[in-house]
Amino acid sequence: MKNRNKALLATLVSLFAISAIAQPNITVLATGGTIAGGGDSATSSSYQAGKVGIDALINAVPETKKIANLSGEQLVNIGSQDMNDQVWLALAKKINQDCDKTDGFVITHGTDTLEETAFFLDLTTQCKKPIVLVGAMRPSTALGADGPLNLYNAVVLATDKSAGERGVLMAMNDKVVQGRNVMKMSTTEVQVFDAVNSGAEGFIHDGKVTYFQAPQPRGDKAAFDVSKLEKLPAVGIVYNYANASAAPVKALREEGGEGIVSAGVGNGNMYKTVFDALAKAAKEDVVVVRSSRVPTGYTTRNAEVDDNLYGFVASERLNPQKARVLLQLALTQTKDPQQIQALFEKY
């Protein structure tokens, strides 16, 4: 009997060990943000982003260890208002280099520029493993902090192999949104992100992922190869409004900008002085993209503005900040407005 019990115990231990080993390996790349923030009061909206390190974040959600083997790496620890090209490039290179070493990636990130990072990574990563961005609207010290559940759900999503067929994703407040479509819609609400022109990809509930939309398979290669890039071309955004000044156009050109995105009114329209300055810039080898400050809809080519005549590019479905990301990458390949227009129609 004792020998039988010992054999049974050994079998159970062996099965437990196999189960633990069989868990997917998820790499957590930390960049800071509110999810890593802390404040002096549990009820105050004042806090400092990027105070908590990745190990502390992971240890604060022990439930994640029941579904995956997590390894964390702190790339930077900043508020995402300070996100920059160097961090983007480091993230893309890291994911591409380590794709075969892990089963998926979770990237902790501030919400301010998360949509830009998500779009950049969607265009520059060739890894077909799940890549999930996650953030929080309340710091870890706040009552009702949303970060822990968001992180847990992001790990759940990263362990779903089929998520790798959907490009870069974001997981927050139980919602799954495609990185190309995600947009921040509120300055303070917990339900902060949406996909205004396409709808959410799915949702996560009780540790399970449900998808609303069919996947759009990624190609074998990234849209843009950034493996040898150390920086991106300089591109700025000019905001349009009643009686707008063209001074920002002049300033961007003096700084050596290779491209300018116009955050236009309506269907990408521009105030006359801004229009004239951008038309002049387009003639002088600066790529000009028309977008709109309106959060939904498309900026259509040759609508009220004759893009063919002035050499402008229409941003299609992209808002100004995402149009800037695509223009930066496009300029690493070409300065031809027609070729760049084709890229905007494709991506």
What is each residue range found by the language model?
Residues 1-9:
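Bacterial N-terminal signal peptides that target proteins for export
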Residues 134-205:
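Internal gly/pro-rich beta-alpha loop/helix module
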Residues 118-149, 155-159, 283-292:
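Short, acidic/small-residue loops that bind anionic groups at enzyme active sites
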Residues 108-129, 270-279:
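Short Gly/Thr/Asp-enriched flexible loops that form oxyanion-binding sites at enzyme active sites
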Residues 267-347:
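C-terminal non-catalytic interaction/assembly regions of soluble proteins
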Residues 17-19:
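N-terminal signal peptide c-region/cleavage motif recognized by signal peptidases
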Residues 23-96, 276, 280:
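ATP/NTP phosphate-donor binding region
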Residues 24, 29, 53, 57-62, ...:
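Accessory alpha-helical/coil subdomains and C-terminal extensions
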